[in-house]
A protein has these predicted regions:
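Proline/glycine-rich low-complexity loops and linkers
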Residues: 126-157, 162, 248-320, 328
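An N-terminal, well-structured beta->alpha segment
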Residues: 1-63, 67-68, 145-173, 380-381
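Short glycine-rich phosphate-binding loop at a beta-alpha junction
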Residues: 40-49, 73, 172-174, 275-281, ...
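Gly/Ser/Thr-enriched, mixed-charge loops and adjacent short helices
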Residues: 13, 108-228
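N-terminal small/polar loop signature for handling phosphorylated ligands or for N-terminal nucleophile
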Residues: 32, 36, 43-108, 188-246
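Phosphate-binding and adjacent anionic-ligand microenvironments
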Residues: 269-446
């Protein structure tokens, strides 16, 4: 068995990579590892998205936790950032979110948070993994307890509402819940904000999460925004830790643009701590140039919101995120939060009194292409030293003449190598990306 924890916890197809036996072991091992570091009773919050497998995995995980004497509090269907927020609010020892984010319903995952609502550090995950891969967890005669929490949604939603600032209630908004976690919270949130909102894709059945809906499938949202002549469209992913938007014309406003809008607003109000925005190596070149033009320091990390957050904590920065819509507003949250992000943008939209398209136009997005090449798992550690791949990359970089960039990186959760190119012309970079992808596929493809 390979390494279980990826960049975003454990994830896989239910019944194959992720079984109830594994969930039981995760609960058992996590309770033992974290319990041995704490003198007080271990209290663990468990949330889940809307997948049919969520309840089964939550039950198995709960059994493992309780077998080590932990007190389990079931939050039910909530967004991932709700677990992160409530761990600290409820003074719990640990939080667990059962979700596979933007993946289809046959996938699920287990994400662990510490007592402050931060994702567990790699060292702690590695310690837990030793027990999952064979090391026996010491047994105990102490048995834990289980209870259902009926205040989680209200407590989380009220927290988001508290970050709103004079939002224009005349704004017409369409919200896509992706048949996921936001279905349980977004309608309540916008009702409390007193907004004119049309909510779509909220009637989940356990199988339709992310199915032609949400931040990975914006077509339906675009259609509704145009049809209803709405001011803005908002799309969440399956566990609502990311948010993408579309303007009044149905044009995408991605995570990079959201960060540009937010960081400039913070700078203008004197609140951009240490004058820095944190992105990743995958952030659009347009965001980097936007920061240069507006005298904002841009800090790039490895891909993954956990690495963005680590840099933010290390250097006391307050905003960071990814193009995919994972945006962290550190003054309010310890992880990416889709609903929080959407409220911050609505705050700015209301304050400026302009159309969403004008707000988003402050950043020029460079044409970008991303090709995912399916490869053998072991290839993710071999391609960098391959002479043919290196030659293909260098050839394309030379042709770009400094007006673009090439980035090749392995996926943290799947057997993929991602080929990303940015440049001035879409057709040109599409061809260049395919050249590199073809070389990788020929050498390392499945």
């Amino acid at each position: 068995m390979g390494k279980l924890f990826g960049t975003d916890g454990i994830r896989g197809i239910v019944g194959e990579d992720l079984t109830h036996e594994l969930a039981l072991k995760v609960g058992e091992a996590a309770a033992y590892v974290l319990g041995s570091k704490s003198k007080k009773e271990l209290t663990v919050l468990i949330g889940r998205d809307t997948r049919i497998s969520g309840q089964m995995l939550a039950s198995a995980l709960s059994a493992g936790l309780m077998s080590q004497g932990a007190k389990v509090i079931d939050l039910g269907v909530v967004p991932t950032p709700a677990v992160s927020y409530l761990v600290e609010k409820y003074d719990a020892s640990m939080g667990v979110m059962i979700s596979a984010s933007h993946n289809p319903s046959e996938y699920n995952g287990i994400k662990l948070f510490n007592h402050e609502g931060f994702k567990l550090p790699d060292a702690t995950e590695n310690e837990i993994e030793k027990y999952l891969l064979g090391k026996a967890v010491p047994t105990t005669t102490k048995v834990g307890t289980y209870e259902v929490c009926d205040t989680a949604i209200d407590d989380y939603v009220n927290h988001i509402v508290d970050t709103s600032k004079d939002i224009n209630k005349k704004l017409k908004i369409v919200v896509d819940c992706a048949y996921g976690s936001a279905s349980a919270t977004a309608p309540i949130l916008f009702d409390k904000l007193g907004m004119d909102v049309v909510v779509m894709n909220y009637e989940y059945d356990g199988y339709n999460i992310n199915d032609k809906a949400g931040s990975t499938h914006l077509e339906g949202l675009v259609k509704q925004v145009k049809k209803l002549k709405a001011d803005v469209g908002i799309a969440y992913d399956g566990d609502a830790d990311r948010c993408l938007m579309v303007d009044e014309n149905g044009v995408l406003v991605d995570g990079d643009q959201i960060m540009a809008i937010s960081s400039l607003d913070l700078k203008e109000s004197g609140d951009l701590r240490n004058n820095t925005l944190v992105g990743t190596v995958m952030s659009n070149l347009g965001l980097v140039k936007f920061c240069e033009q507006n005298d904002i320091h841009f800090e790039a990390t490895k891909v993954g919101d956990r690495y963005v957050l680590e840099k933010m904590i290390e250097c006391d920065y307050i905003i960071g995120g990814e193009q995919s819509g994972h945006v962290i507003f550190k003054d309010f949250a310890n992880t990416g939060d889709g609903e929080l992000t959407s409220v911050q943008i609505l705050n700015i939209l209301s304050k400026k009194g302009v159309k969403m398209s004008e707000l988003a136009s402050i950043m020029k997005t460079y044409p970008q292409v991303l090709i995912n090449v399916k490869v053998r798992e072991e290839a993710k550690g071999q391609y960098e030293n391959d002479s043919q791949v290196t030659k293909a990359i260098q050839s394309v970089e030379k042709e770009l003449k400094g007006e673009g960039r090439v980035l090749i990186r392995p996926s943290g959760t799947e057997a993929l190598i991602r080929v990303m190119i940015e440049g001035l012309d879409q057709e040109d970079i599409d061809k260049k990306a395919k050249q590199i992808a073809d070389v990788i596929e020929k050498k390392f493809g499945v």
